[in-house]
């Protein structure tokens, strides 16, 4: 008897990227055939399903860069205006919160909310932190690093979010 060996992830129609599209930030923006018939599309072949990986990478993914001179966070917030965003620094953490109230769109009513928390390196100068949102919806949070012998200062404070008119220079994944 021949048995095909498959990784269990490919056998499950409820894998990590499937059908989570029903519950992600694109909820209410239209459905694909495989959203409605997950078991039918997975029984034909798991390899014929359209990949949602690209969609997942393009939606709400953050990138953290920490080099010798600077600490930077890039976060896709294209569904939020700067007024909908709150950025706070508490001790060694930066908290980014976005929420907009329920509003009507082409498919009904929709509301979105997210909360991200990142640990700041101990040598980031917290008095020189900045945050901005580019025209294409990319939030950039950055701060310079200080020499290890200097005190970076730790307290709670809000960071204002400014709007930039040009698109982000962050690399796309």
From Swiss-Prot:
The keyword Repeat does not apply. Zn(2+) 3 binds at residue 154. GO terms for molecular function: metal ion binding; structural constituent of eye lens; unfolded protein binding. Keywords: Acetylation, Chaperone, Cytoplasm, Eye lens protein, Glycoprotein, Metal-binding, Methylation, Nucleus, Phosphoprotein, Zinc. Acetylation at Lys-70 may increase chaperone activity. Transmembrane segments: none annotated. Disulfide bonds: none annotated. Residues 52-162 form the sHSP domain. Residues 153-167 have a biased composition (Basic and acidic residues). Pfam families: Crystallin, HSP20. This is Alpha-crystallin A chain. It comes from Perodicticus potto edwarsi.
